[in-house]
């Protein structure tokens, strides 16, 4: 039985902000700023890998994002700090009469490392989801970033027949542009099924990592099984970009995690230790 979606026509808009900053103190990364307004929180910081890597779980208690809602994240890492940020479950963008927005600002000082590893966003038919991410790297700062988006509810047979999804990603190192993209997907658009678009796959995922890998590891990454379509490219300027199209979010997630397992030791010098929250 498929549960009815909540009627959010008269939902009062939430405007939420979360500001996080991390600093290196000796051999440990410590959270030094944690400010929030509205329904955005972080759970207690964890050190599953030891004191060097500070893990935070980002929580949005309402559980869904409706028309007029806005979420703003500001994440800053000082020199040599290392943070890993993830989420406990999917972000749900509900159908709405007006746009819902999320902005993410990331600033990394030299020697800092950020792993931004949230779970998927589900964009329901009729939603108007607009996301903007701006990332500034300084010096030799390191980044491992991914996002996953499911359009409609494929498991329930719901296609993304109306609404829109807009996402912009801008990455710079010392103010020099490394990567910029902007995509807009309209509900019912022919690109959803076109072979030059999503080719009928309702789930799309992107991974961007700073650094370079050798040809052998690149081929091992490309050979990973993918229950959909996935590939990885090494770009000039020291960026790796991976794409995946899949029929279910769990397939895209599994592929990203396997890429992370292969790439993390080479790029970040540590074996991959999946956060426990991914198993709950």
UniProtKB/Swiss-Prot annotation:
Physiological role: Required for maturation of urease via the functional incorporation of the urease nickel metallocenter.
Higher taxonomy: Bacteria, Pseudomonadati, Pseudomonadota, Gammaproteobacteria, Pseudomonadales
Annotated S-S bridges: none
Cited HAMAP family: UreD
Gene responsible for this protein: ureD
Any GO molecular function: nickel cation binding
Quaternary structure (record): UreD, UreF and UreG form a complex that acts as a GTP-hydrolysis-dependent molecular chaperone, activating the urease apoprotein by helping to assemble the nickel containing metallocenter of UreC. The UreE protein probably delivers the nickel.
InterPro entries (UniProt xref): UreD
Family (UniProt): Belongs to the UreD family.
Keyword Chaperone in annotation: yes
Alphabetized UniProt keyword annotations: Chaperone, Cytoplasm, Nickel insertion
Superkingdom, natural source: Bacteria
Subcellular location: Cytoplasm
Entry GO terms, CC: cytoplasm
Main localization (coarse): cytoplasm
Protein name (database record): Urease accessory protein UreD
């Amino acid at each position: 039985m498929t549960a009815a979606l909540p009627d959010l026509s008269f939902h009062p808009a939430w405007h939420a902000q979360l500001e996080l900053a991390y600093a290196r103190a000796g051999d440990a990364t410590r959270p030094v700023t944690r400010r929030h307004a509205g329904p955005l929180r972080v759970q207690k910081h964890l050190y599953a890998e030891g004191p060097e890597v500070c893990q935070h779980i980002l929580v949005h208690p309402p559980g869904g994002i409706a028309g007029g809602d806005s979420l703003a994240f500001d994440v800053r890492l000082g020199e040599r700090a290392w943070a890993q940020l993830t989420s406990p479950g999917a972000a749900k963008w509900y159908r709405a009469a007006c746009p819902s927005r999320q902005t993410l600002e990331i600033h990394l000082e030299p020697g800092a490392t950020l792993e931004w590893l949230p779970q998927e966003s589900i964009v329901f038919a009729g939603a108007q989801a607009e996301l903007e991410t701006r990332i500034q790297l300084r010096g030799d700062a390191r980044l491992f970033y991914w996002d996953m988006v499911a359009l409609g509810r494929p498991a329930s047979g719901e296609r993304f027949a109306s609404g829109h999804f807009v996402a912009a990603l801008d990455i710079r190192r010392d103010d020099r542009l490394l990567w910029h993209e902007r995509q807009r997907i309209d509900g019912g658009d022919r690109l959803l099924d076109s072979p030059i678009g999503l080719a009928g796959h309702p789930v799309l995922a992107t991974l961007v990592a700073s650094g370079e890998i050798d040809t052998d590891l690149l081929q091992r990454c490309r050979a990973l099984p993918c229950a959909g379509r996935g590939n990885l490219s090494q770009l000039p300027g020291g960026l790796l970009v991976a794409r995946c199209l899949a029929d279910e979010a769990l397939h895209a997630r599994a592929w990203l995690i396997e890429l992370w397992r292969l790439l993390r030791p080479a790029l970040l010098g540590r074996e991959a230790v999946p956060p426990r929250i991914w198993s709950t």
